[in-house]
A protein has these predicted regions:
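Disulfide-stabilized, aromatic/cysteine-rich ligand-recognition loop
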Residues: 38, 42, 46, 210-212, ...
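Residue-level detector of short, conserved catalytic/binding motifs and their immediate flanks
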Residues: 81, 86-88, 181, 214, ...
Length: 291
């Protein structure tokens, strides 16, 4: 499957499997095998961080951020928009090779062999959009069945909440803290706060970022993260977050990757790929949301 990308209002472009990081015209695209495990241990269980309800800033333009791409602009009239989101939770780190390996061992899911052929603590890559959603469904079921699930999370699951991918808006609120910051930690690029312009991913959560919104790690760089939003021009519409479009949409990815330039790891930068894309620079993290 080929990853497709635009940058602004430019030409359609393609990338083959040998290409692992680039930006074309506003939309940018971008170990040893694990022992079998049947369900998450405490170490593999995600740490969910509450992202409180309230307003958020979404989008950017060159007036406020000279690095912004055209597809980040909210509308012809304004560079940024404001949304109000209810409470949701996001995992503190990206899903690791170890955690994804537990899912594969428990379910017999057909994973790309390269997804598990990496250090256990690294963020899993070579996962498609359906792969990520399948992991979410398995994780939800195992958390419901586990006596070790945090009481707050267990209660939400009993109340009908689900484990899934974050929407594009949820991801951006978590990355920006609801304000105008360009990066999860502020407005200035910092190589000590994110893994970008480098040769390979690092362990999920390895790079501490005490200034980052909500204490989340790797919201900039390391691997692009799938969302459950199909790519659409702004202004953002939550009604477009339809998880049944697997064959018909480009799906938004956020955060940039280890081999991307700093421009692509800004909190408002938007990437997208076809749902079947499995690449060395695409991973995900999980969300807990009300149905």
């Amino acid at each position: 499957m080929i990853v497709r990308a635009w940058v602004g209002a430019g030409r359609l472009a393609t990338r083959g499997p040998d290409l692992v990081g680039s930006c074309l015209l506003g939309l940018c695209l971008v170990g040893a095998p694990l022992a079998a495990q049947t369900q998450p241990t405490a170490k593999l269980r995600p740490e969910f961080v509450a992202i409180g309800p309230g307003p958020m800033t979404m989008g950017a333009d060159a007036t406020r951020d000279p690095q912004a791409f055209d597809n980040e602009r909210w509308s012809a009239a304004q560079g940024e928009g404001t949304l109000d989101l209810p409470l949701f939770y996001l995992s503190r780190t990206e899903v690791t090779v170890a955690a994804f390996g537990a899912f594969v061992a428990a379910t017999g899911a057909k994973a790309d062999p390269r997804a598990l052929d990496a250090p256990a603590a690294q963020p899993v890559a070579f996962v498609s959009w359906p792969d990520a959603l399948a992991y979410c469904r398995w994780l939800e079921a195992t958390l419901k069945a586990s006596s070790g699930t945090a009481p707050e999370i267990a209660q939400h699951l009993r109340d009908g909440w689900r484990v899934t991918l974050p929407t594009e808006a949820q991801w951006e609120k978590a990355a920006r803290g609801g304000d105008h910051r360009r990066y999860p930690w502020g407005d200035t690029p910092r190589r000590d706060r994110a893994n970008y312009e480098s040769a390979a991913p690092v362990a999920a959560g390895q790079i501490a970022c005490p200034e980052c919104a909500y204490g989340l790690t790797d919201m900039a760089g390391n691997v692009w993260e799938w969302t459950r939003s199909p790519y659409q021009p702004y202004p953002y519409d939550e009604a477009d977050d339809r998880s049944g479009l697997e064959a018909d949409a480009l799906w938004v990815m956020r955060g940039g990757a280890f081999n991307d330039p700093v421009r692509l790891v800004r909190a408002s930068a938007r990437g997208a790929a076809e749902p079947g894309a499995r690449r060395a620079f695409i991973g995900f993290r999980v969300a807990l949301v009300a149905r």
